[in-house]
Protein backbone atom coordinates (compact mmCIF):
# COMPACT_ATOMS: atom_id res chain seq x y z
CA UNK A 1 0.00 0.00 0.00
CA UNK A 2 1.17 3.52 -0.79
CA UNK A 3 0.29 4.69 2.72
CA UNK A 4 2.91 2.24 4.05
CA UNK A 5 5.49 3.53 1.55
CA UNK A 6 4.88 7.15 2.57
CA UNK A 7 5.38 6.36 6.25
CA UNK A 8 8.44 4.13 5.79
CA UNK A 9 10.48 6.30 3.47
CA UNK A 10 9.58 9.78 2.35
CA UNK A 11 6.48 11.38 3.92
CA UNK A 12 4.40 12.84 1.09
CA UNK A 13 2.98 16.30 1.70
CA UNK A 14 0.37 17.63 -0.76
CA UNK A 15 -0.74 21.26 -0.70
CA UNK A 16 -4.23 21.78 -2.15
CA UNK A 17 -5.49 25.05 -3.61
CA UNK A 18 -9.27 25.03 -4.19
CA UNK A 19 -10.85 27.86 -6.17
CA UNK A 20 -13.25 29.95 -4.08
CA UNK A 21 -16.53 28.64 -5.51
CA UNK A 22 -18.76 25.91 -4.09
CA UNK A 23 -18.64 23.68 -7.17
CA UNK A 24 -14.84 23.80 -7.14
CA UNK A 25 -14.25 23.51 -3.38
CA UNK A 26 -16.60 20.58 -2.71
CA UNK A 27 -14.68 17.97 -4.77
CA UNK A 28 -11.30 19.38 -3.65
CA UNK A 29 -12.21 18.78 0.00
CA UNK A 30 -13.21 15.22 -0.96
CA UNK A 31 -9.85 14.78 -2.73
CA UNK A 32 -8.05 15.98 0.41
CA UNK A 33 -9.76 13.30 2.46
CA UNK A 34 -9.13 10.55 -0.11
CA UNK A 35 -5.40 11.32 -0.19
CA UNK A 36 -5.20 11.66 3.60
CA UNK A 37 -6.76 8.20 3.91
CA UNK A 38 -3.65 6.92 2.08
CA UNK A 39 -1.33 8.49 4.65
CA UNK A 40 -0.51 11.68 2.73
CA UNK A 41 -0.13 14.84 4.82
CA UNK A 42 -2.58 17.42 3.41
CA UNK A 43 -2.51 21.20 3.71
CA UNK A 44 -5.46 23.11 2.27
CA UNK A 45 -4.83 26.79 1.50
CA UNK A 46 -7.92 29.01 1.34
CA UNK A 47 -9.48 32.20 2.69
CA UNK A 48 -11.24 32.51 6.10
CA UNK A 49 -14.81 32.56 4.75
CA UNK A 50 -14.22 29.51 2.55
CA UNK A 51 -12.52 27.64 5.37
CA UNK A 52 -15.58 28.24 7.55
CA UNK A 53 -17.87 26.63 4.95
CA UNK A 54 -16.11 23.29 5.34
CA UNK A 55 -15.25 23.51 9.02
CA UNK A 56 -17.62 20.76 10.18
CA UNK A 57 -16.69 18.20 7.51
CA UNK A 58 -12.95 18.80 7.90
CA UNK A 59 -13.15 18.81 11.72
CA UNK A 60 -14.73 15.34 11.60
CA UNK A 61 -11.98 14.16 9.23
CA UNK A 62 -9.22 15.56 11.47
CA UNK A 63 -10.82 14.09 14.62
CA UNK A 64 -10.88 10.69 12.91
CA UNK A 65 -7.08 10.90 12.63
CA UNK A 66 -6.63 12.09 9.05
CA UNK A 67 -3.50 14.28 8.61
CA UNK A 68 -5.26 17.37 7.23
CA UNK A 69 -4.61 20.99 8.14
CA UNK A 70 -6.06 24.25 6.82
CA UNK A 71 -4.01 27.39 6.33
CA UNK A 72 -5.98 30.61 5.90
CA UNK A 73 -4.81 33.54 3.80
CA UNK A 74 -6.61 36.87 3.62
CA UNK A 75 -7.96 37.79 0.20
CA UNK A 76 -6.51 41.22 -0.77
CA UNK A 77 -9.92 42.55 -1.80
CA UNK A 78 -9.25 46.26 -1.33
CA UNK A 79 -5.98 46.20 -3.29
CA UNK A 80 -7.75 44.55 -6.24
CA UNK A 81 -10.72 46.94 -6.22
CA UNK A 82 -13.07 44.26 -4.91
CA UNK A 83 -15.66 45.27 -2.27
CA UNK A 84 -15.19 43.50 1.07
CA UNK A 85 -17.36 40.44 1.65
CA UNK A 86 -16.85 38.96 -1.83
CA UNK A 87 -14.64 36.02 -0.89
CA UNK A 88 -16.52 33.49 -2.99
CA UNK A 89 -17.42 33.35 -6.66
CA UNK A 90 -21.07 32.63 -5.83
CA UNK A 91 -21.27 35.78 -3.64
CA UNK A 92 -20.47 38.14 -6.53
CA UNK A 93 -23.50 40.27 -7.36
CA UNK A 94 -22.47 41.38 -10.86
CA UNK A 95 -20.23 40.55 -13.83
CA UNK A 96 -18.28 43.78 -13.15
CA UNK A 97 -16.77 42.14 -10.07
CA UNK A 98 -15.42 39.15 -12.01
CA UNK A 99 -12.09 40.69 -13.07
CA UNK A 100 -11.38 42.29 -9.63
CA UNK A 101 -12.18 38.92 -8.02
CA UNK A 102 -9.68 37.05 -10.20
CA UNK A 103 -7.12 39.82 -9.63
CA UNK A 104 -7.52 39.48 -5.86
CA UNK A 105 -7.23 35.70 -6.07
CA UNK A 106 -3.99 35.85 -8.07
CA UNK A 107 -2.54 38.46 -5.70
CA UNK A 108 -2.36 35.61 -3.16
CA UNK A 109 0.93 34.57 -4.80
CA UNK A 110 3.09 36.63 -2.41
CA UNK A 111 1.56 35.48 0.91
CA UNK A 112 1.45 31.89 -0.36
CA UNK A 113 5.14 32.08 -1.30
CA UNK A 114 5.93 33.09 2.28
CA UNK A 115 3.87 30.15 3.53
CA UNK A 116 5.87 27.72 1.40
CA UNK A 117 9.17 29.10 2.71
CA UNK A 118 8.08 28.14 6.23
CA UNK A 119 6.19 24.91 5.48
CA UNK A 120 7.33 21.68 7.10
CA UNK A 121 7.71 19.06 5.84
CA UNK A 122 8.55 20.54 2.47
CA UNK A 123 5.62 20.03 0.05
CA UNK A 124 6.03 17.15 -2.41
CA UNK A 125 3.20 18.21 -4.71
CA UNK A 126 0.69 20.97 -5.40
CA UNK A 127 -2.85 20.18 -6.49
CA UNK A 128 -4.37 23.39 -7.80
CA UNK A 129 -7.67 24.37 -9.31
CA UNK A 130 -7.15 25.48 -12.91
CA UNK A 131 -8.59 28.92 -12.06
CA UNK A 132 -5.51 29.70 -9.93
CA UNK A 133 -2.68 30.13 -12.46
CA UNK A 134 -0.40 31.82 -9.89
CA UNK A 135 0.24 28.40 -8.32
CA UNK A 136 2.37 27.52 -11.39
CA UNK A 137 4.86 30.19 -10.32
CA UNK A 138 4.92 28.76 -6.79
CA UNK A 139 5.52 25.25 -8.17
CA UNK A 140 8.35 26.47 -10.40
CA UNK A 141 10.03 28.52 -7.65
CA UNK A 142 10.05 25.61 -5.19
CA UNK A 143 10.65 22.90 -7.83
CA UNK A 144 7.46 21.03 -6.93
CA UNK A 145 5.22 19.17 -9.41
CA UNK A 146 1.84 20.83 -9.88
CA UNK A 147 -1.22 18.72 -10.62
CA UNK A 148 -4.21 20.52 -12.10
CA UNK A 149 -7.80 19.92 -11.08
CA UNK A 150 -10.40 21.19 -13.56
CA UNK A 151 -13.57 19.80 -11.98
CA UNK A 152 -14.72 18.71 -15.45
CA UNK A 153 -15.15 15.31 -17.11
CA UNK A 154 -12.74 13.81 -19.67
CA UNK A 155 -15.31 14.38 -22.45
CA UNK A 156 -15.19 18.13 -21.82
CA UNK A 157 -11.44 18.31 -21.24
CA UNK A 158 -10.77 16.40 -24.46
CA UNK A 159 -13.15 18.70 -26.36
CA UNK A 160 -11.28 21.78 -25.12
CA UNK A 161 -7.92 20.18 -25.94
CA UNK A 162 -8.97 19.28 -29.50
CA UNK A 163 -10.34 22.76 -30.18
CA UNK A 164 -7.17 24.42 -28.86
CA UNK A 165 -5.14 22.25 -31.23
CA UNK A 166 -7.48 23.05 -34.14
CA UNK A 167 -8.21 26.75 -33.62
CA UNK A 168 -9.38 27.24 -37.19
CA UNK A 169 -12.61 25.35 -36.43
CA UNK A 170 -13.88 28.10 -34.12
CA UNK A 171 -12.26 30.90 -36.12
CA UNK A 172 -14.08 29.87 -39.31
CA UNK A 173 -17.56 29.94 -37.75
CA UNK A 174 -19.74 32.69 -39.21
CA UNK A 175 -21.86 33.20 -36.08
CA UNK A 176 -22.47 31.98 -32.54
CA UNK A 177 -25.57 30.13 -33.80
CA UNK A 178 -23.64 27.97 -36.29
CA UNK A 179 -23.04 24.34 -35.27
CA UNK A 180 -19.75 22.50 -35.78
CA UNK A 181 -18.65 18.89 -35.32
CA UNK A 182 -15.78 18.24 -32.90
CA UNK A 183 -13.06 16.47 -34.93
CA UNK A 184 -11.05 13.44 -33.75
CA UNK A 185 -13.74 12.60 -31.20
CA UNK A 186 -14.90 9.07 -30.28
CA UNK A 187 -18.53 10.08 -31.05
CA UNK A 188 -20.09 12.54 -33.47
CA UNK A 189 -20.97 15.56 -31.34
CA UNK A 190 -22.06 19.05 -32.42
CA UNK A 191 -21.81 22.35 -30.55
CA UNK A 192 -22.17 26.06 -31.11
CA UNK A 193 -19.20 28.21 -30.05
CA UNK A 194 -20.79 29.59 -26.82
CA UNK A 195 -21.59 26.02 -25.67
CA UNK A 196 -17.88 25.15 -25.31
CA UNK A 197 -15.98 26.36 -22.20
CA UNK A 198 -13.54 29.24 -22.80
CA UNK A 199 -14.21 29.21 -26.56
CA UNK A 200 -15.76 32.68 -26.86
CA UNK A 201 -13.29 35.54 -27.21
CA UNK A 202 -13.80 38.35 -24.70
CA UNK A 203 -11.41 41.30 -25.17
CA UNK A 204 -9.55 43.13 -22.42
CA UNK A 205 -8.51 41.98 -18.97
CA UNK A 206 -10.76 38.89 -18.97
CA UNK A 207 -8.96 37.62 -22.09
CA UNK A 208 -5.62 38.04 -20.31
CA UNK A 209 -6.91 36.06 -17.32
CA UNK A 210 -8.05 33.26 -19.63
CA UNK A 211 -4.67 33.21 -21.39
CA UNK A 212 -2.90 32.90 -18.02
CA UNK A 213 -5.15 29.93 -17.19
CA UNK A 214 -4.37 28.23 -20.52
CA UNK A 215 -0.62 28.83 -20.10
CA UNK A 216 -0.68 27.41 -16.56
CA UNK A 217 -2.46 24.33 -17.93
CA UNK A 218 0.38 23.71 -20.40
CA UNK A 219 3.09 23.87 -17.72
CA UNK A 220 1.41 21.56 -15.19
CA UNK A 221 2.89 18.13 -14.46
CA UNK A 222 -0.43 16.36 -14.84
CA UNK A 223 -4.18 16.39 -14.25
CA UNK A 224 -6.55 14.61 -11.89
CA UNK A 225 -10.12 14.15 -13.09
CA UNK A 226 -13.23 13.53 -11.00
CA UNK A 227 -14.61 10.76 -13.18
CA UNK A 228 -14.11 7.01 -13.52
CA UNK A 229 -12.70 4.96 -16.38
CA UNK A 230 -15.85 2.87 -16.84
CA UNK A 231 -18.07 5.94 -17.33
CA UNK A 232 -16.29 7.45 -20.33
CA UNK A 233 -13.54 4.98 -21.34
CA UNK A 234 -12.83 6.29 -24.85
CA UNK A 235 -12.61 9.89 -23.64
CA UNK A 236 -10.51 8.99 -20.59
CA UNK A 237 -8.04 7.07 -22.77
CA UNK A 238 -7.78 9.80 -25.42
CA UNK A 239 -7.37 12.54 -22.83
CA UNK A 240 -4.70 10.58 -20.99
CA UNK A 241 -2.85 10.17 -24.28
CA UNK A 242 -3.19 13.92 -24.94
CA UNK A 243 -1.59 14.57 -21.52
CA UNK A 244 1.31 12.16 -22.22
CA UNK A 245 -0.06 9.69 -19.70
CA UNK A 246 -0.18 12.17 -16.83
CA UNK A 247 -3.95 12.17 -16.31
CA UNK A 248 -5.50 10.21 -13.46
CA UNK A 249 -9.24 9.50 -13.16
CA UNK A 250 -9.91 9.20 -9.42
CA UNK A 251 -13.67 9.66 -9.03
CA UNK A 252 -16.42 9.81 -8.13
CA UNK A 253 -14.74 11.60 -5.21
CA UNK A 254 -18.15 12.22 -3.58
CA UNK A 255 -18.23 8.55 -2.58
CA UNK A 256 -15.71 9.25 0.19
CA UNK A 257 -18.70 10.71 2.09
CA UNK A 258 -19.90 7.63 3.93
CA UNK A 259 -21.14 9.25 7.18
CA UNK A 260 -24.67 10.70 7.09
CA UNK A 261 -23.49 14.05 8.48
CA UNK A 262 -20.84 14.36 5.75
CA UNK A 263 -23.44 13.64 3.07
CA UNK A 264 -25.92 16.09 4.57
CA UNK A 265 -23.40 18.94 4.95
CA UNK A 266 -21.40 18.38 1.76
CA UNK A 267 -20.57 21.90 0.58
CA UNK A 268 -22.64 23.72 3.17
CA UNK A 269 -25.07 23.19 6.03
CA UNK A 270 -28.47 22.31 4.59
CA UNK A 271 -31.33 24.81 4.91
CA UNK A 272 -33.81 22.06 5.70
CA UNK A 273 -33.84 19.63 8.60
CA UNK A 274 -32.39 16.34 7.38
CA UNK A 275 -34.98 14.22 9.20
CA UNK A 276 -37.84 16.35 7.87
CA UNK A 277 -36.56 15.92 4.33
CA UNK A 278 -36.12 12.15 4.66
CA UNK A 279 -39.55 11.77 6.31
CA UNK A 280 -41.14 13.57 3.34
CA UNK A 281 -39.29 11.29 0.91
CA UNK A 282 -40.31 8.19 2.89
CA UNK A 283 -43.96 9.11 2.30
CA UNK A 284 -43.57 8.90 -1.51
CA UNK A 285 -43.60 5.86 -3.78
CA UNK A 286 -40.36 4.35 -5.02
CA UNK A 287 -38.91 6.20 -8.03
CA UNK A 288 -41.76 8.73 -8.11
CA UNK A 289 -40.01 11.98 -7.02
CA UNK A 290 -38.30 14.43 -9.35
CA UNK A 291 -35.45 16.32 -7.65
CA UNK A 292 -34.93 19.80 -9.15
CA UNK A 293 -31.76 21.80 -8.53
CA UNK A 294 -30.10 24.23 -10.94
CA UNK A 295 -26.86 24.84 -9.07
CA UNK A 296 -25.29 27.28 -6.63
CA UNK A 297 -24.52 30.16 -9.01
CA UNK A 298 -27.34 30.60 -11.50
CA UNK A 299 -30.50 32.54 -10.78
CA UNK A 300 -32.86 32.17 -13.72
CA UNK A 301 -35.17 35.12 -14.45
CA UNK A 302 -38.51 35.15 -12.64
CA UNK A 303 -40.40 34.55 -15.90
CA UNK A 304 -38.50 31.26 -16.46
CA UNK A 305 -38.80 30.13 -12.85
CA UNK A 306 -42.58 30.61 -13.02
CA UNK A 307 -42.78 28.44 -16.15
CA UNK A 308 -40.63 25.80 -14.47
CA UNK A 309 -42.90 25.81 -11.41
CA UNK A 310 -46.10 25.61 -13.45
CA UNK A 311 -44.64 22.79 -15.54
CA UNK A 312 -43.76 20.85 -12.40
CA UNK A 313 -47.28 21.42 -11.10
CA UNK A 314 -48.91 20.25 -14.33
CA UNK A 315 -46.71 17.13 -14.45
CA UNK A 316 -48.76 15.88 -11.47
CA UNK A 317 -45.62 14.21 -10.08
CA UNK A 318 -44.11 14.69 -6.61
CA UNK A 319 -41.03 16.91 -6.63
CA UNK A 320 -38.39 18.58 -4.48
CA UNK A 321 -37.39 21.99 -5.84
CA UNK A 322 -34.25 23.68 -4.51
CA UNK A 323 -34.14 27.43 -5.05
CA UNK A 324 -30.68 28.81 -4.31
CA UNK A 325 -29.48 32.40 -4.15
CA UNK A 326 -32.62 33.01 -2.14
CA UNK A 327 -31.88 36.68 -1.41
CA UNK A 328 -32.03 37.31 -5.16
CA UNK A 329 -35.35 35.50 -5.50
CA UNK A 330 -37.65 37.47 -3.19
CA UNK A 331 -40.04 38.01 -6.12
CA UNK A 332 -40.31 34.26 -6.60
CA UNK A 333 -41.11 33.83 -2.91
CA UNK A 334 -43.92 36.35 -3.33
CA UNK A 335 -45.18 34.53 -6.43
CA UNK A 336 -45.16 31.19 -4.57
CA UNK A 337 -47.62 32.57 -2.01
CA UNK A 338 -49.61 35.18 -3.96
CA UNK A 339 -50.33 32.93 -6.97
CA UNK A 340 -51.39 30.06 -4.72
CA UNK A 341 -48.61 27.84 -6.14
CA UNK A 342 -47.23 26.80 -2.76
CA UNK A 343 -50.71 25.98 -1.46
CA UNK A 344 -51.66 24.00 -4.60
CA UNK A 345 -48.55 21.79 -4.55
CA UNK A 346 -48.14 21.45 -0.76
CA UNK A 347 -49.07 17.74 -0.72
CA UNK A 348 -46.60 16.68 -3.41
CA UNK A 349 -44.06 19.51 -3.70
CA UNK A 350 -41.28 20.21 -1.20
CA UNK A 351 -39.62 23.62 -1.63
CA UNK A 352 -36.11 24.02 -0.19
CA UNK A 353 -35.02 27.63 -0.01
CA UNK A 354 -31.22 27.62 0.07
CA UNK A 355 -28.84 24.63 0.31
CA UNK A 356 -30.08 21.05 0.14
CA UNK A 357 -28.63 17.76 1.42
CA UNK A 358 -28.27 16.64 -2.21
CA UNK A 359 -26.38 13.38 -1.69
CA UNK A 360 -28.94 12.15 0.86
CA UNK A 361 -31.83 13.07 -1.43
CA UNK A 362 -30.37 11.40 -4.53
CA UNK A 363 -29.63 8.23 -2.54
CA UNK A 364 -33.27 7.89 -1.42
CA UNK A 365 -35.34 5.13 -3.06
CA UNK A 366 -38.29 7.44 -3.79
CA UNK A 367 -36.23 9.69 -6.12
CA UNK A 368 -36.61 8.68 -9.77
CA UNK A 369 -35.29 11.69 -11.69
CA UNK A 370 -32.97 14.68 -11.34
CA UNK A 371 -33.58 17.97 -13.19
CA UNK A 372 -30.07 19.44 -13.20
CA UNK A 373 -28.08 22.36 -14.62
CA UNK A 374 -25.46 19.75 -15.59
CA UNK A 375 -22.65 21.07 -13.43
CA UNK A 376 -20.23 18.14 -13.34
CA UNK A 377 -20.51 17.55 -9.57
CA UNK A 378 -24.30 17.25 -9.80
CA UNK A 379 -24.19 15.24 -13.03
CA UNK A 380 -21.79 12.72 -11.52
CA UNK A 381 -23.71 12.53 -8.23
CA UNK A 382 -26.89 11.78 -10.16
CA UNK A 383 -25.26 9.02 -12.21
CA UNK A 384 -23.47 7.60 -9.16
CA UNK A 385 -26.85 7.39 -7.40
CA UNK A 386 -28.34 5.58 -10.41
CA UNK A 387 -30.77 8.43 -11.20
CA UNK A 388 -31.66 9.42 -14.81
CA UNK A 389 -31.19 13.11 -15.58
CA UNK A 390 -33.33 15.87 -17.08
CA UNK A 391 -30.74 18.30 -18.44
CA UNK A 392 -31.01 22.10 -18.29
CA UNK A 393 -27.50 23.46 -19.01
CA UNK A 394 -26.73 27.13 -18.46
CA UNK A 395 -23.06 27.93 -19.17
CA UNK A 396 -19.46 26.73 -18.75
CA UNK A 397 -18.93 22.98 -19.18
CA UNK A 398 -22.64 22.24 -18.75
CA UNK A 399 -23.50 21.80 -22.45
CA UNK A 400 -20.59 19.36 -22.77
CA UNK A 401 -21.96 17.39 -19.84
CA UNK A 402 -25.42 17.38 -21.40
CA UNK A 403 -24.05 15.90 -24.65
CA UNK A 404 -22.25 13.19 -22.69
CA UNK A 405 -25.35 12.35 -20.63
CA UNK A 406 -27.97 12.47 -23.39
CA UNK A 407 -26.13 11.46 -26.58
CA UNK A 408 -23.21 9.29 -25.46
CA UNK A 409 -24.30 7.61 -22.21
CA UNK A 410 -28.02 7.80 -23.05
CA UNK A 411 -29.03 8.24 -19.40
CA UNK A 412 -30.76 11.60 -19.72
CA UNK A 413 -33.39 13.69 -21.50
CA UNK A 414 -32.81 17.26 -22.66
CA UNK A 415 -35.25 19.93 -21.48
CA UNK A 416 -34.64 21.63 -24.83
CA UNK A 417 -32.22 24.40 -23.80
CA UNK A 418 -29.90 25.32 -26.68
CA UNK A 419 -28.98 28.90 -25.77
CA UNK A 420 -26.27 29.68 -23.25
CA UNK A 421 -27.47 31.62 -20.18
CA UNK A 422 -24.34 33.51 -19.19
CA UNK A 423 -23.92 34.12 -15.50
CA UNK A 424 -25.14 37.62 -14.65
CA UNK A 425 -27.03 37.97 -17.95
CA UNK A 426 -30.04 35.76 -17.22
CA UNK A 427 -32.62 38.53 -17.70
CA UNK A 428 -31.52 39.05 -21.33
CA UNK A 429 -32.48 35.48 -22.22
CA UNK A 430 -35.98 35.26 -20.73
CA UNK A 431 -38.01 32.06 -21.12
CA UNK A 432 -36.22 29.18 -22.88
CA UNK A 433 -38.60 26.38 -21.83
CA UNK A 434 -42.30 27.07 -21.21
CA UNK A 435 -44.51 25.09 -18.83
CA UNK A 436 -45.65 22.71 -21.59
CA UNK A 437 -42.02 21.98 -22.46
CA UNK A 438 -41.22 21.30 -18.82
CA UNK A 439 -44.23 18.99 -18.43
CA UNK A 440 -43.36 17.08 -21.61
CA UNK A 441 -39.70 16.62 -20.62
CA UNK A 442 -40.65 15.43 -17.12
CA UNK A 443 -43.04 12.87 -18.60
CA UNK A 444 -40.40 11.64 -21.05
CA UNK A 445 -37.93 11.14 -18.20
CA UNK A 446 -40.24 9.74 -15.53
CA UNK A 447 -42.73 7.84 -17.72
CA UNK A 448 -42.99 4.16 -18.55
CA UNK A 449 -41.88 4.17 -22.20
CA UNK A 450 -39.31 1.61 -23.35
CA UNK A 451 -36.73 4.39 -23.69
CA UNK A 452 -37.37 5.58 -20.12
CA UNK A 453 -37.03 2.03 -18.76
CA UNK A 454 -33.80 1.53 -20.72
CA UNK A 455 -32.38 4.80 -19.35
CA UNK A 456 -33.16 3.74 -15.80
CA UNK A 457 -31.51 0.36 -16.32
CA UNK A 458 -28.40 1.88 -17.91
CA UNK A 459 -27.86 4.55 -15.24
CA UNK A 460 -28.24 1.98 -12.44
CA UNK A 461 -25.49 -0.09 -14.06
CA UNK A 462 -23.25 2.99 -14.29
CA UNK A 463 -23.97 3.73 -10.62
CA UNK A 464 -22.85 0.22 -9.63
CA UNK A 465 -19.67 0.61 -11.71
CA UNK A 466 -18.94 3.87 -9.87
CA UNK A 467 -19.05 2.09 -6.51
CA UNK A 468 -16.67 -0.61 -7.78
CA UNK A 469 -14.26 1.99 -9.22
CA UNK A 470 -13.52 3.51 -5.80
CA UNK A 471 -13.19 0.19 -3.94
CA UNK A 472 -9.76 -1.36 -3.40
CA UNK A 473 -8.65 -2.82 -6.74
CA UNK A 474 -11.08 -0.61 -8.67
CA UNK A 475 -9.90 1.70 -11.45
CA UNK A 476 -10.07 4.97 -9.48
CA UNK A 477 -8.57 3.46 -6.33
CA UNK A 478 -5.69 2.07 -8.41
CA UNK A 479 -5.19 5.42 -10.15
CA UNK A 480 -4.72 7.18 -6.79
CA UNK A 481 -2.07 4.56 -5.99
CA UNK A 482 -0.42 5.22 -9.36
CA UNK A 483 -0.46 9.00 -8.79
CA UNK A 484 1.12 8.69 -5.34
CA UNK A 485 3.80 6.31 -6.62
CA UNK A 486 4.60 8.78 -9.42
CA UNK A 487 4.96 11.71 -6.99
CA UNK A 488 6.92 9.49 -4.56
CA UNK A 489 9.48 8.69 -7.26
CA UNK A 490 9.80 12.39 -8.12
CA UNK A 491 10.21 13.35 -4.46
CA UNK A 492 12.90 10.73 -3.91
CA UNK A 493 14.80 11.72 -7.07
CA UNK A 494 14.78 15.37 -5.93
CA UNK A 495 16.37 14.48 -2.61
Curated annotation (Swiss-Prot):
<dbReference type="InterPro" id="IPR002213">
    <property type="entry name" value="UDP_glucos_trans"/>
</dbReference>
<dbReference type="InterPro" id="IPR035595">
    <property type="entry name" value="UDP_glycos_trans_CS"/>
</dbReference>
<feature type="active site" description="Proton acceptor">
    <location>
        <position position="24"/>
    </location>
</feature>
<keyword id="KW-0808">Transferase</keyword>
<feature type="binding site">
    <location>
        <position position="378"/>
    </location>
    <ligand>
        <name>UDP-alpha-D-glucose</name>
    </ligand>
</feature>
<feature type="binding site">
    <location>
        <position position="24"/>
    </location>
    <ligand>
        <name>an anthocyanidin</name>
    </ligand>
</feature>
<protein>
    <recommendedName>
        <fullName>UDP-glycosyltransferase 73C11</fullName>
        <ecNumber>2.4.1.368</ecNumber>
    </recommendedName>
</protein>
<feature type="binding site">
    <location>
        <position position="373"/>
    </location>
    <ligand>
        <name>UDP-alpha-D-glucose</name>
    </ligand>
</feature>
<feature type="binding site">
    <location>
        <position position="376"/>
    </location>
    <ligand>
        <name>UDP-alpha-D-glucose</name>
    </ligand>
</feature>
<keyword id="KW-0328">Glycosyltransferase</keyword>
<feature type="binding site">
    <location>
        <position position="396"/>
    </location>
    <ligand>
        <name>an anthocyanidin</name>
    </ligand>
</feature>
<feature type="active site" description="Charge relay">
    <location>
        <position position="129"/>
    </location>
</feature>
<feature type="binding site">
    <location>
        <position position="381"/>
    </location>
    <ligand>
        <name>UDP-alpha-D-glucose</name>
    </ligand>
</feature>
<feature type="binding site">
    <location>
        <position position="377"/>
    </location>
    <ligand>
        <name>UDP-alpha-D-glucose</name>
    </ligand>
</feature>
<comment type="similarity">
    <text>Belongs to the UDP-glycosyltransferase family.</text>
</comment>
<dbReference type="GO" id="GO:0016134">
    <property type="term" value="P:saponin metabolic process"/>
</dbReference>
<dbReference type="GO" id="GO:0035251">
    <property type="term" value="F:UDP-glucosyltransferase activity"/>
</dbReference>
<dbReference type="Pfam" id="PF00201">
    <property type="entry name" value="UDPGT"/>
</dbReference>
<feature type="binding site">
    <location>
        <position position="358"/>
    </location>
    <ligand>
        <name>UDP-alpha-D-glucose</name>
    </ligand>
</feature>
<feature type="binding site">
    <location>
        <position position="398"/>
    </location>
    <ligand>
        <name>UDP-alpha-D-glucose</name>
    </ligand>
</feature>
<feature type="binding site">
    <location>
        <position position="397"/>
    </location>
    <ligand>
        <name>UDP-alpha-D-glucose</name>
    </ligand>
</feature>
<comment type="function">
    <text>The monoglucosylated hederagenin 3-O-beta-D-glucoside is a feeding deterrent of the yellow-striped flea beetle (Phyllotreta nemorum).</text>
</comment>
Amino acid sequence: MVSEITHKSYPLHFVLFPFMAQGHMIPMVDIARLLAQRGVKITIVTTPHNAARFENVLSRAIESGLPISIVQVKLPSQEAGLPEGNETFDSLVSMELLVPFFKAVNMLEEPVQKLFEEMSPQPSCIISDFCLPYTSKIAKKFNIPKILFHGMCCFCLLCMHVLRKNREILENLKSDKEHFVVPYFPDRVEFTRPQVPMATYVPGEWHEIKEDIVEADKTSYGVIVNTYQELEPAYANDYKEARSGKAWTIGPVSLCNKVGADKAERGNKADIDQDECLKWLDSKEEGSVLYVCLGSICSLPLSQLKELGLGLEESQRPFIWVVRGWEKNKELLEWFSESGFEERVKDRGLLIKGWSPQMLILAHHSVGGFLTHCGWNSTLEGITSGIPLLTWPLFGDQFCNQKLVVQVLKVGVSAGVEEVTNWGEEEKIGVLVDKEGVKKAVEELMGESDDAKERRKRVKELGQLAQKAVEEGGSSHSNITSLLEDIMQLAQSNN
